[in-house]
Amino acid sequence: MLTDVIMCTYELIDKCTKEIEKEDKQMRDQALALIIKEAKKSVFDGWTDWRYNLLKSGICLCDEKSAKKLEKVLDTLLEISREDYFPEYTKKEDLIVRYLLHRHLYGKENTQKELYQNILINELRIIAIKDAMEEKNYDEAEKLCLEKANAENTWHYRSGDPEDWNNVLYDIYKTANNREKQIAQAKKLLLMGNEKFWGVLKQIYRECGAWNENYESLLDELKDSKRTVCYRSVLISENEKKRLLEDVMENPYDLFYYGKYLVKEYPEQIYELCYKEISESCAQAKDRREYKKITKNIVQLIKWKGNDTAKSLIEELKQRYPRKPALLDELEKVEKKL
């Protein structure tokens, strides 16, 4: 994808500027001038984040004198943005770049006030949290993180994003070696659907010698959380087939995926579920494309050695829908495989 190409390009630019940072002032100034020249081009109009990301890559090349050139460009871009539909977005990017520039020039201690003045900007809050953790000020890191984590609804949670506030909060507790809060946060993330934290909790509880006593109750809580995919993935990993069958019977969601884990031990129950699910799907189907999906499931039933169930099902569907020639045609194709 184009975005991947762009991101790889920016990574390469960052690597180059980090190397040029070690060279003499003349080379650093030339590289910075080139970055500024490119960032000013109209090709970046409408792509504010890419423009400012390019400028960020030039920060490491700056000394106090050359930094004035970069800030002059920032001033110009900020002035132009007043005519945009969303000038506040440019303002945010501007504040981030200026802070990173000042931090580069004067150090984190001398720019802490500027950092906290703009703490509502997520990117800067993350920096403040990392600074606090480096200083082992875990209470401050927790406070900064909780202010955001508590303000967001659980459906905002992005399990795969390491900078999601709830993920950051877990990392804080882990780094601080706060076992009690670590367990509580790991459980919260599991019940929000992050399957990874089942393994995390398993390891922590085993280290405490408390895994067996917490195992069943943790499964019950996960079931009650209604995070079906997460719950079933955990059941599969723990080989909890009886629980998995009960859950699939309560809700046959994705039956033809989960059935493969159950059909060997519970063939009759799975065949019965397949019969019912296919019958109900057929009642809703209206064209050949949907009929093909139905017959694909019948083929799967046959692969699971449910031939007798498949025969009965095909006969019933043929009798129930004699005026659906496309369906009858697809059923006949499957019937030949019996």
Feature locations, PLM:
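Eukaryote-biased, non-catalytic alpha-solenoid scaffold regions
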Residues: 1-338
